[in-house]
């Protein structure tokens, strides 16, 4: 095996998906602890703390104490190199969260055992389904009261339409939480709470049918056996291929706060989740072990560092090897650029990078020339697909405080749209400018960045738009007919693409029914 193939085989690139407050921050912290990336868990501090979490960047995040921005953390574990992409998990998240999922090979779904499947989890799973991303599941908070575990598995299957295969099974919960039982390998992992940065020694009881297990479970023993019978009768067995196809998720139980069960999940990512996968480009499929370098941009981040007024473009490497000072072609512009200062991400300790392989994420300094979806290569004309725009779910009309600044406003919005901070629409029948976003916070971010970076002050007004759909139609005559009929609701987006702004859900359904030859798309590829 070549050095490059060996490096690729070691890589695991995944993201965590969860509803806010299901425990994502805590589990991230414990995962970093396992990779000894942070000496003391707790660098990702609580909101009340005045020392800010290392992955909270922009000014506004400091005020709100949330990580709007998606950071990337790389750490070693069991002779593998783990790339963990953090997804903004606050009530207000953004299209970045969705796009981050296009750059990973697998995902870890964290559910709150007391609440089960929540709305944000459903939305994120829909995005994972676009690429059949393999999902590992962790049911968290067993140190509190949780719902019946069988009920939780049923809910995963019914709501998320994915088979659930329990790997471990909880013995009690809350004050009676005694650990988990490994279904396939017949042993108990005893629960001892490890607080903060303690890693407690794992105590294992071999075989459920043993005096030691009976003593540990006490009065619960018989009841646990009955429950197990139910579980083994009703649940799916783990199947590696179905997992890789995104049709089945292995389920683990534990408590991130008590530092219990998190290692089981990380082991599953190492043992079962795929190494960096081939990526589809318009021209061909690119294999990760190819010698020539290639990668795509999935996110652009403004001033990660208040001291450096720069933008960082996050690139997922798809093939080859990045070496410091190498030349690569920016395919969209046709220009060759020498990259001497790519960044690797170790939370916010920004480090200069010497080399990186397929599956790794690197940061390029961007002075406004790089856009989301851009491909970089060693000269070959490639355009990676699967980094879409997602239909916004919230809309506002923009109002300028100073009408003379409309040029700066358009310029600023164009730039912010290319960075993926918002989507901008220009209705065909009016001079309005409409912004679209996936999370409310995006509007605040845009307003504060327009003010700081473009010296433009704006306010927002509500507008009746339910959703946006990108219009495609191969029949020119039909498209013209449709455009004349629907002109009141048509707009061009920032890239000049025809978009239908549906005022209501009913209206959208009616239009789709009336115009069967017109495709109303909820995602649009970049470029």
UniProtKB/Swiss-Prot annotation:
Database matches in HAMAP family: Rel_fac_3
Annotated residues for binding of GTP: 18-25, 86-90, 140-143
All copies of domain tr-type G, residue ranges: 9-277
One function term, GO molecular function aspect: guanosine tetraphosphate binding
Compartments where located: Cytoplasm
PANTHER family named in the record: PEPTIDE CHAIN RELEASE FACTOR RF3
Keywords, sorted A to Z: Cytoplasm, GTP-binding, Nucleotide-binding, Protein biosynthesis
PROSITE patterns: G_TR_1 (PS00301), G_TR_2 (PS51722)
Sequence similarity: Belongs to the TRAFAC class translation factor GTPase superfamily. Classic translation factor GTPase family. PrfC subfamily.
Function: Increases the formation of ribosomal termination complexes and stimulates activities of RF-1 and RF-2. It binds guanine nucleotides and has strong preference for UGA stop codons. It may interact directly with the ribosome. The stimulation of RF-1 and RF-2 is significantly reduced by GTP and GDP, but not by GMP.
Name of the molecule in the record: Peptide chain release factor 3
Keyword Transport on entry: no
GO BP, one annotated term: regulation of translational termination
Pfam families according to UniProt: EF-G_D2 (PF22042), GTP_EFTU (PF00009), RF3_C (PF16658)
């Amino acid at each position: 095996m070549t050095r490059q193939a060996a490096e690729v085989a070691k890589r695991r690139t995944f993201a965590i998906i969860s509803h806010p407050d299901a425990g994502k921050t805590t589990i991230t912290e414990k995962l970093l602890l396992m990779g000894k990336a942070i000496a003391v868990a707790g660098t990702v501090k609580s909101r009340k703390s005045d020392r800010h979490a290392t992955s909270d960047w922009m000014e506004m995040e400091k005020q709100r104490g949330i990580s709007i921005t998606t950071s990337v953390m790389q750490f070693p574990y069991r002779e593998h190199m783990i790339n963990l992409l953090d997804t903004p998990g606050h009530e207000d998240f953004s299209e970045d969260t969705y796009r981050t999922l296009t750059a990973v090979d697998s995902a870890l779904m964290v559910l709150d055992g007391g609440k089960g499947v929540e709305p944000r989890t459903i939305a994120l799973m829909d995005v994972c389904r676009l690429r059949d991303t393999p999902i590992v599941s962790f049911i968290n908070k067993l140190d509190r009261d949780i719902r019946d575990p069988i009920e939780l598995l049923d809910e995963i299957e019914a709501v998320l339409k994915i088979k659930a295969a329990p790997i471990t099974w909880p013995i009690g919960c809350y004050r009676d939480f005694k650990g988990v039982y490994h279904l396939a390998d017949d042993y108990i992992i005893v629960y001892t709470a490890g607080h903060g940065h303690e890693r407690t020694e794992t105590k294992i009881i071999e075989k459920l049918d043993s005096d030691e297990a009976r003593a540990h479970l006490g009065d619960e023993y018989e009841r646990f056996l009955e429950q197990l019978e139910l579980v083994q009768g009703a649940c799916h067995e783990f199947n590696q291929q179905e997992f890789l196809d995104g049709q089945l998720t292995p389920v683990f139980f534990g408590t991130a706060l008590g530092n219990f069960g998190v290692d089981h999940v990380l082991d599953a990512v190492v043992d079962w989740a795929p190494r960096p996968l081939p990526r589809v480009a318009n021209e061909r499929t690119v294999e990760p072990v190819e010698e020539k370098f290639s990668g795509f941009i999935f996110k652009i981040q403004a001033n990660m560092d208040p001291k450096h007024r720069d933008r960082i473009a996050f690139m997922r490497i798809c093939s080859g090897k990045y070496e410091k000072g190498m030349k690569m072609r920016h395919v969209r512009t046709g220009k060759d650029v020498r990259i001497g200062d790519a960044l690797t991400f170790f939370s916010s300790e920004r480090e200069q990078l010497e080399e990186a392989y397929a599956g790794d994420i690197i940061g390029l300094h961007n002075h406004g020339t790089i856009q989301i979806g851009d491909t970089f290569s060693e000269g070959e004309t490639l355009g990676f697909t699967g980094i879409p725009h997602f239909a916004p779910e919230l809309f506002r009309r923009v109002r300028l405080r100073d009408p003379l600044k409309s040029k700066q406003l358009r310029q600023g919005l164009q730039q912010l749209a290319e960075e993926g901070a918002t989507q901008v629409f220009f209705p065909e029948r009016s001079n309005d400018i409409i912004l679209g976003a996936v999370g409310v916070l995006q509007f605040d971010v845009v307003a504060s960045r327009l003010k700081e970076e473009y010296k433009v002050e704006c306010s927002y007004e509500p507008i009746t738009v339910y959703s946006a759909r990108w219009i495609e139609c191969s029949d020119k005559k039909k498209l013209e007919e449709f455009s004349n009929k629907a002109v009141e609701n048509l707009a061009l987006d920032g890239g000049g693409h025809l978009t239908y702004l549906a005022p209501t859900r009913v209206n959208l359904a009616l239009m789709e029914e009336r115009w069967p030859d017109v495709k109303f798309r909820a995602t649009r590829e970049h470029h």
